[in-house]
Amino acid sequence: MRVGMYYNNRDVRLEEMLKPKIGPGEILLKMKASGICGSDLMEWYRIKKAPLVLGHEVSGEIAETGEGVKNYKVGDRVFVAHHVPCNTCRYCLTGNHTACQTLHTTNFYPGGFAEYIRVPALNVDRGTFLLPESVSFEEGTFIEPLACVLRGQRTVNIGPGQSVLILGSGISGLLHLLLAQSMGAGRIMMTDINEFHLNMAKELGAEAVINAKDDVIGALRQVNEGRLADLVIVCAGASTVFNQALQAVERSGTILCFAPTAPGETLNVPVNDFWRNQIKIIHSYGSGPRDNAMALELLKAKRVKVDRLITHRLKLGQIGEGFRIMAESKDSIKVIIES
């Protein structure tokens, strides 16, 4: 079978591998659509394991079922989560599934940029979701990234009327925009240095878009009646953006850190100011089964219309081109690889 083999961000090759064989409780998924995630381009992290097949935003059709699989059959349209929890550890039992060691070590094989994917029994049991005909394979690739966004906003308990500043208008920032709108947030303002991203944010309904090179704090106060933001969501990994978040949050407000930085980056927090002003800093990583299920329901109900975010549709044979487009980030939001 054909796979997209990652060597580095500028070298992703179409190669041949043996089609995986499945065992009891497993399924073989024929990939129909697979999204390129921004984390796929975190070269400092990925290159340590290269060469490898990436891709974790996957939907497809079941090609084979292993012995003992009862809830799924050949031909079913499904989304499959790459990370699934044990549901028995102290983290899972307190609702913190994304801290589970099992979740951090599970995966499917070889990765989403392949014609066929072996889904282990644990992922079949806890991470496989049937797609109704009303949800396309393309929309199915958004379940995982939307679930991550949903978990983040659930963690900070976003409320009606809250002002929100989203730092970074790439795919995660725009998903935060769409979800915050559906959750009843008040003014939503967004920043970026990419004019294409800013224009997309404006088209999708952001109250204001601000070039990150300009006076973000001044522009924020001008739009938000002199106030800073109740919730600041960091969706860009530059250390300058995190420092901007410290300046942009209103008293008793919250900063949601949704993006990693390069290794070794540190953040200097004015502790006394944050203590006096009761500022909360919260991080959010990944998604759990509940988040995936809720994301699917939002897509089924068309409450979050993700099709507007797809800028490029490419075949598996164009995987290298897809990574190039994402890395350059000139006029792209979401690149979908199709079989």
Spell out what each predicted region is.
Residues 3, 243-247, 289-339:
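C-terminal hydrophobic helical "lid"/dimerization subdomain
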Residues 7, 18-19, 49-55, 105-111, ...:
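Short Gly/Pro-enriched turn/cap motifs at secondary-structure boundaries
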Residues 20-34, 45-90, 132-134:
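Glycine-rich beta-strand-centered segment in the early N-terminal region that forms part
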Residues 75, 161, 206, 228-229, ...:
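Local beta-strand N-terminus motif with an aromatic residue
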Residues 135-214:
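Mid-domain Rossmann-like dinucleotide-binding core that forms the NAD(H)/NADP(H) cofactor-binding site
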